[in-house]
Amino acid sequence: MITLRPITDDDREFLYRLYVSTRAAEKELVGWTNEQWDEFLRMQFNLQHTQYMRNYEQPSFDVIMLGDTPVGRLYVNRVPVEIRIIDISLLPEYRNRGIGAGLMRNILREGNDSNIPVTLHVEKNNPALGLYQRLGFRINGDQGVSWFMERVATPVFESGRQNIPSP
């Protein structure tokens, strides 16, 4: 069963390992030693973590759990005008298993229920771009290396069902 729990200081190494897994494809491009790569990624991880902690009004920073096993992270900022998905990441062995899509659909329902858009940024080369588009996100801005995407709230039908596409 998939659950979420707030991050703690004890999660720092897991979160770093998760972050490293999202950057694995880049390692071959730079030609650095393992020590140089690790030092660079630790610096980047710490900067990202600090920026996330400081720059959002109503954030929730959660570890995605599969039973007792941490498998990813979901960071979301909820404010009256939008729900911003700050970050959703899964360890490689848990990707493409419907975990992320299920969590995304839950957030989209929340946006529909509150009648506010769900937004996110995604790097242009991120394979998740296709999932986001299938879930109804549309590109709403070019940020250079990333897209700003938005999914507007859709009405709840009289039957009580919402129009949330399956991926």
Feature annotation, model-predicted:
Residues 52, 132, 137:
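Conserved active-site tyrosine of GNAT-family acetyltransferases
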Residues 96-109, 130-134:
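Conserved acetyl-CoA-binding loop-helix of GNAT-fold acetyltransferases
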